[in-house]
Amino acid sequence: MDMDSGSMGVAFQPSEPIASTILCCECGVPTPPNAAAMCMDCIKMTTDITSGIPRESTVNHCRECERYMQPPNNWMIAPLESRELMAICLKKLRGLNQVRLVDANFIWTEPHSRRIKVKLTVQKEAFTNTILQQSFQVEFYVNNTQCPDCARTYTPHIWKAVCQVRQKVLHKRTFLYLEQIILKHKAHMNTVNIKETKDGIDFYFGQRAHAIKMVEFLSAVVPIRYKGSEELISEDFKSNTANYKFTYSIEIVPICKDDLVCLPKTVAKAHGNIAQLVVCTKVGPTIRFLDPLTLQTCDMLPSIYWRTPFPALADIPELTEFIVADVDLLGPTNGKYALADVELIKSSDGSTHLTRTHLGGILNAGNTVLAYHLAVTNFNNEVYDTLREDSIPEVVIVKKTYPQTKKKNRNWRLKTIGMQKAEDVKKQDIERQERDYELFLQNLEEDPELRQGVNLYKAPVKAIAVADTDMDEEDEVDEDIPQISVDELLDDVEAMHI
């Protein structure tokens, strides 16, 4: 049969497939087929994937060292709401390995409540092709206890190794600076005790590795040499074990900043043929010497010094005060130093002297300087006696001084290490320590390079108010006097009781 030309065909459109559903066995709501035969809402209500995870736990905290116990026997520093504290808390939850941890964060609590709350989000496959995600809170109780290291500090003779640091000089300015470096880098955190002796400091450690770490730290900041020894305490032949105590004797080079030194001839030639009569300008991992007549400098390694040791020719107590009458710059410079001819007037008798100095860039007529007056000083030094008289200047200028009108109450302060003081300290020693400490504070104010290795903290508000009052009472204040700006000071968080 022929189709009419005007008729139109109808296209076949298949119907959309209808997904099969089942009725939920709990509430009767149609739901896609699954192994539980329940809808998602009923699965969430009847299935708890966190049933094996405890909602409460305990973490051990040491009051002395502020460390938390990390199972099984480790103790670590973990500030509040830190990643380290979160790791400690999660390791306390036994059933956490049965689920997949998606998120974990702290819930704020009062610091004094001794509670730590953590919100966890986990996932787990409850049935075939059915993954559930739930969030819940876990509360940890902070159990204040005492770690083994802190417990040993209250027991005598518990140290395993000791570092005995010594320097054969008549002052303790080096140890004052070393104390601030140790505080800045927290190198004393592993000590069980620190004792101050007449000519040094003893650091006691519970482990030998901590003592070795201290020796390495000291060698990186001051020129030293050390010698190790061990003492047998007990021995067990059955188990083939022995108990030793280790001692590290550390000696710092007896050369300090601003000391006048006469180098042996062989040592001077080995260091760029520098002049034998030099001034020590810096003490660090190496010793830096400067020739004040030529501005030539050299750095000496501690190993070279101990190979041919030599004493300081003169130190700070032997400095004499002079007044600058005239300064004539010669032109040569070396960093912050500038060579100049200076005419000086001795403060005690008014005699005039001509000398050459490396401090021409900061000296002006009328300034006061401290210098070694070699023309009237006798030295008991064999190397110095071999020098030619025409190579020895009358006066060697070391540093510029400032009027002593500075306020006693400074707007900054230093922290100290809580160490056990030496016994039977004489009154003279106490007065000398106070003078050394005041001189150390003045050096910090005058030397910006020295302040880089020290943490300076803001003084309490009362001290600052008293200092401002003292400054108001002064008629005139020399602007040339070095002062420490507030930008260099740190806030003392411990003093704020945060």
Swiss-Prot record:
The gene is nmd3. InterPro entries: Nmd3, Nmd3_N, NMD3_OB, NMD_SH3. It comes from Schizosaccharomyces pombe (strain 972 / ATCC 24843). Belongs to the NMD3 family. Acts as an adapter for the XPO1/CRM1-mediated export of the 60S ribosomal subunit. One of its GO terms (biological process) is ribosomal large subunit export from nucleus. It comes from the Eukaryota. One of its GO terms (molecular function) is protein-macromolecule adaptor activity. PANTHER family: 60S RIBOSOMAL EXPORT PROTEIN NMD3, NONSENSE-MEDIATED MRNA DECAY PROTEIN 3. It is found in: Cytoplasm; Nucleus, Nucleoplasm. Keywords: Cytoplasm, Nucleus, Protein transport, Transport. Associates with the 60S ribosomal subunit. The keyword Ribonucleoprotein does not apply. This is 60S ribosomal export protein nmd3. GO terms for cellular component: cytoplasm; cytosol; nucleoplasm; nucleus. Pfam families: NMD3, NMD3_OB, NMD_SH3.
